[in-house]
C-alpha cells in the first residue's frame, strides 16, 4: 500500500508554550498534503486523546507539535506502542534534545564545540558573582527544556542574573546560564541526513526571541548565508551533532559563531516550524525543494 492510500493525521496545537506556532505549522502542513492528494486530517491534540488515533483508523502521523509531549519522546513512545509510523526523531533523540543541558553534555563528551555553561537547579542558591566570574558578561539564561526562546533572557549585569534565573525557573526546574557568543547566528536544517544551506538570522532586537521568530516582520533571514567552504565546515559539525543525539528524518540545529568566527552548537529542534516565517522551508527552497515537496519528503521519511 502506498502512503497516499493511508489515513494520515497531522498532529498540531497541543498545550505547550508553543501552541500558537504549532497551530500555524499544522494548518500549512495539512493544506500542503491535501493539495498533493493525501488522505489527511488535521487534529489539535489539545482536544483529542492520542490513544484514540487507532480507533479513528489513523495509519500514519505527521507530527508538527512543537515542545511538550510532541517533542519530548512521550508522543513518540505512545505512537510506537500503537504501531503507528510517525515523522521525525524517535523516542530517545526527542527526549534528549528537548533537554538542552543533556544535549550539550553529549556534544561535549565527544568534543563538539558548544558555549560554556553553569547549571542552576530549582531550590539551589545562586551565586551570581561566581557564575559571572566563570562565564563573563553578558550571559544568556534559559530553561533547559523550553523551545521558541520561551523564558530566555540576555543578562548584561550581575544584578540582572538572579531575576533572569527566577524567570527561567517558572518554565523548568533546570536552568542554563551560558557564556555569550559574540558572532553571527545561524540555523541549519537537516533532511534525511543531508545538511541544507545555513540560514543566518538577523533579529531586530537583542536576540532571536519569540517575537522575532513568529511575530516580527523585521527579522532578516539570509540564505544561502555562507561561502562554500564555510558551509562545508558547518555541515560537518551539524551532521556530527545530529548523529550524536540520534536524530532521524529531519531536524534543525542552531549554531552561533564566537568572537573568532568559530562555530558553536546551540540546540536541536526535532520538530521544526513550518510557518510562513519558518527557517526550514526557506533553506529548502534555495536547493529546489518547494514547500509541498518538503512536506511530502518529511512524510515519506516517517518510520
UniProtKB/Swiss-Prot annotation:
Catalytic activity: 2 D-alanine + ATP = D-alanyl-D-alanine + ADP + phosphate + H(+)
Functional pathway: Cell wall biogenesis; peptidoglycan biosynthesis
Record EC number: 6.3.2.4
Enzyme class of the recorded protein, top EC level: ligase
SUPFAM superfamilies reported in the protein's UniProt record: Glutathione synthetase ATP-binding domain-like, PreATP-grasp domain
Name of a matching Pfam family: Dala_Dala_lig_C
Binding site residues for Mg(2+) 1: 254, 267
Binding site for ATP: 132-187
Cofactor binding notes: Binds 2 magnesium or manganese ions per subunit.
Signal peptide: none
Annotated compartments: Cytoplasm
Source superkingdom: Bacteria
PANTHER family named in the record: D-ALANINE--D-ALANINE LIGASE, D-ALANINE--D-ALANINE LIGASE B
The protein's role, per its UniProt record: Cell wall formation.
Family according to the record: Belongs to the D-alanine--D-alanine ligase family.
The protein's name in its UniProt record: D-alanine--D-alanine ligase
Organism of origin: Actinobacillus pleuropneumoniae serotype 5b (strain L20)
